[in-house]
A protein has these predicted regions:
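C-terminal motif of bacterial Sec signal peptides marking the signal peptidase cleavage site
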Residues: 12-14
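Short, solvent-exposed recognition patches
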Residues: 42-128
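Acidic/histidine-rich, surface-exposed loop or edge segments in extracytoplasmic proteins
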Residues: 23-28, 83-85, 137
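Sec-dependent signal peptide recognition
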Residues: 1-8
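N-terminal "mature-domain start" segment
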Residues: 18-76, 149-160
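A short, solvent-exposed beta-edge/loop patch
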Residues: 117-160
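Second-shell loop/turn segments in exported
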Residues: 29-34, 86-91, 140-146
Length: 160
């Protein structure tokens, strides 16, 4: 009786139709950016109060191989963690600057991460290997996200 029961279970499992999902293919179709809090200005402490773990500050005057600033108009750049994910926050004077200069440098950062190596990693100014897949423009900041958007959107929504 046990053998028949096990055979039926195996038959049901073998015949069930489960669509295999390839996360790499599906990740390309997901949005890579989000904008919110357009009328607000935030500080590092606002992010810490929202649950972000501050780790270290990066320089704002880093340049690429052509001598162009990587993060033009950035006032501060901080690296830290939220929900065990790498999060970089770039601070600008206001939302207008974060949604132009900040957005442009964020787009370059996520495309650079994808093209950097097989794992998508880039090496930061402190020799950390970090891969950013998406970003949120929130008020006067740009939040670079290690993973896709949900955790970064959650962090930006916790800001007060």
């Amino acid at each position: 009786m046990k053998i028949i029961f096990i055979a039926i279970i195996l038959f049901i499992l073998a015949c069930s139709s489960v669509e295999e999902v390839n996360p790499v293919e599906n990740a390309d179709s997901l949005p890579k950016s989000h904008v919110n809090n357009i009328d607000k200005n935030f500080t590092v402490d606002d992010f810490v109060d929202a649950g972000w773990k501050k780790s270290k500050e990066f320089i704002t005057d880093a340049k690429n191989e052509n001598g162009d600033l990587l993060t033009p108009e950035a006032k501060e750049i901080w690296y830290g963690f939220f929900k065990r994910k790498d999060i970089e926050i770039r601070f600008y004077e206001n939302h207008s600057i974060s949604s132009t200069f900040g957005k442009e440098s964020a787009e370059k950062a996520i495309s650079r991460a994808v093209n950097a190596n097989a794992g998508g990693g880039i090496i930061t100014s402190t020799n950390n290997r970090v891969s950013y897949q998406s970003y949120v423009v929130s008020g006067n900041t740009v939040i670079l996200c290690q993973d896709l958007l949900p955790d970064c959107i959650l962090l930006s929504e916790k800001l007060e």
